[in-house]
Amino acid sequence: MRAQVVARLNRRLSPEQVSADLARCFPGRDDMRVSTETIYHSLYVQGRGALRQELCVAKALRSGRKGRKPRSRLPARGRRPWIAEGPRISDRPAEAADRAVPGHWEGDLIIGGGDQRTCLITLVERSSRFVLISRLGVHDAHSVADRLTAMISGLPAQIARSLTWDQGVKMAACNRFTVATGVKVYFCDPHSPWQRGSNENTNGLIRDFFPKGTDFSTVTDVQVAEAQRLLNLRPRKTLD
């Protein structure tokens, strides 16, 4: 079983995902069951983290720290300009809110280090948690709208119904995007990142591949595509 755990950690699965995946792949095999806490214990406590030393993929663990650190679930409140006009999340169709119908997306930008001009645009489909990632050299409103158009335009209409986004000025050209794609944009309330929680969670997973402070001008499109591929192969507990 240890080899199975190590193999999954090297695929960048979290300990929780490793535990769930083993149960799914080896039904009825009690010898292949291991709890999330047991994996964490082996990584950080038992034998001074001996299991961690067996990982062969650089940064296979989501955090480089040598111990577990509790995470605050309270949203950070930053100072930023807001878009005064536009459809609010309260106007979004009920089918998007309950994830019953595919085609409703959440999106955001991940701003890189360095000159901070290069960024990643991330999109997550709310029903399937399917991820799209694209690298963008500049992130003015028109450039963001045009890249989003390129990302969405290749999708069938039935899986491109709406997009939920923060009220930041980077989406000031949302009408340009909607006219080009037919996809309506709905804006979260100020300081409410949990209203696009699937995207927030996915951005955290993307940081496994590109840690905070990464200069995205040094990242290739091939690397971005590989991160997208691995994320879409990753088992999701919410889909079980």
Where are the model-predicted features located?
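Secondary-structure boundary/capping micro-motif
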Residues: 1-198, 205-215, 229, 236
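Conserved, non-catalytic sequence blocks in retroelement Pol enzymes and Pol-derived host proteins
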Residues: 216-221
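Low-complexity acidic/polar repeat-biased segments
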Residues: 224-226, 234, 238-240
